[in-house]
Amino acid sequence: VYVIDPGEARISRYSPRSKVQRLPVEAVSQASANQRKGRCGRVAPGICVRLFSEEDFLARPEFTDPEIRRTNLASVILQMLHLRLGRIEDFPFIEPPDGRAISDGFTLLQELGAVDRSGAMTDIGRQLARLPVDPRIGRMLLEGARQGCLAELAVIASALAVQDPRERPLEKQQAADQAHAQWNEEGSDFAAFLNLWNGFESQRQALTQSQLRSWCRRNFLNYLRLREWRETHRQIRLTCRDMGLEENKQPASGEPIHKALLAGLLSHLGNKTEEGDYLGARQRRFLLHPSSGLAK
């Protein structure tokens, strides 16, 4: 049994500068490397080949940073307020989070209307604490109910809560983009989620499971992620129903849908510049991902 360890991994990390959660490729810690090595000796003797030097290994941190020190704390703060656990600064964490991360978490919750200026939870915050999704996504759902487009927002919100089911293999990116283009809609990648959902649901009802898996492969879709999307959608709908949020019976137009989405993305707005990129909050410049239907 062989294990080939490149010594790197994508690690979710919150950027205090850009205020977004990122997935940079980083060198793994010694503990992670040793865990990978252990996989080659579980059922039989094996060999682990590390694609980095011993000096590199010894220079690495002993353990990976705990997640509470590399994630946005808005959801943690919201649940602590909901459970009345006291000030987050006074809570006896095993690994206390950074003070700036706590401040950023409160800033986001205030932006969403979940807390007031004093840091006390609002009615919106109490509703958000009941939803099994990130506060930004939960805020979209609450506004979707108010705008009369909760049915569509439940689909989009559940898509944002899971890994994108659309795959772009490095050697077949153009073919994948062409396959995914059938669900694109001019002016909105969010509408593409709705089109993909409707397309998958119609195929799911018409095909056997093996035929459905083949359809997914032909269209560069990950079947397991689509199943996770459906399960997350089911959970969101059940929670919304328990909260008394009513789904619209008639399809909603694009305007109320995007108004609802905007409620959770206020700090993610950007203006297109003459150079073709976008200027966002805090003068941050960014580009659309090549897989976006708007990037073409």
Predicted segment positions?
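Second RecA-like catalytic domain
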Residues: V1-I4, F52-K296
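Conserved segment of the helicase C-terminal RecA-like domain
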Residues: Y2, E8-R60, A74-L78
